[in-house]
Regions:
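Periplasmic/extracellular, small/polar-rich flexible segments of pilin-like filament-forming proteins
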Residues: 55-154
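N-terminal alpha-helical signal peptides/signal-anchor transmembrane segments
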Residues: 30-36, 43-64
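Extracytoplasmic/periplasmic, Sec-exported soluble proteins
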Residues: 38-41, 106
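Weak global preference for isoleucine
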Residues: 10, 18, 22, 30, ...
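N-terminal single-pass transmembrane signal-anchor helix
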Residues: 1-35, 42
């Protein structure tokens, strides 16, 4: 009988199955890392926006002069966020000494994340002694249609 060398079909299928499992695992890790990076970017941009508004309008008695185009131009950043939505600034209608940062264009899971995240410098977070996140949101829309509001000021 003659000796044959090479791989059998079963061995090749085993190798392909292992490679498939590795690929699925790597894809999940990459997706998680990208989601975390986007969330961190939004957090940093909100901090930059809040700092900019306070520096530009902090000397006034209230934030009634807030203007999206002027503020974003003055702080040197776009009002676009990493989710393809926008940031919006506005005066709190119940208290002109407070301003609201709105994050638009979020998926349901990202909206829920930002609503539960501790926005430590926000009005509601400080009033509750850290028991509330400081954000409110509408997270029931379709992906890309959800928004989160965070109030800052006194």
């Amino acid at each position: 009988m003659k000796q044959e060398s090479g791989r059998s079909m079963i061995e090749m299928l085993g190798v392909l199955a292992i490679m498939g499992v590795i690929t699925v695992g790597a894809t999940a890790l990459i997706s998680s890392a990208m989601r975390t990076q986007k969330r961190n970017t939004v957090n940093e941009e909100v901090i930059q926006i809040v700092t900019g508004v306070r520096q530009l309008l902090g000397e006034y008695d209230d934030f009634s002069g807030i203007d999206n185009k002027k503020i974003f131009g003055a702080i040197g950043m776009s009002n676009k966020n990493t989710y393809g939505g926008t940031y919006e600034l506005g005066v709190d209608s119940s208290n002109p000494r407070q301003f609201v940062v709105t994050i638009n264009g979020l998926s349901k899971s990202d909206c829920e994340y930002f609503v539960t995240k501790a926005w430590s410098d926000s009005v509601e977070y400080q009033k509750s002694d850290g028991k509330q996140s400081g954000a409110t949101g509408n997270c029931n829309g379709e992906n890309g249609q959800n928004s989160v509001r965070i109030t800052y000021g006194e």
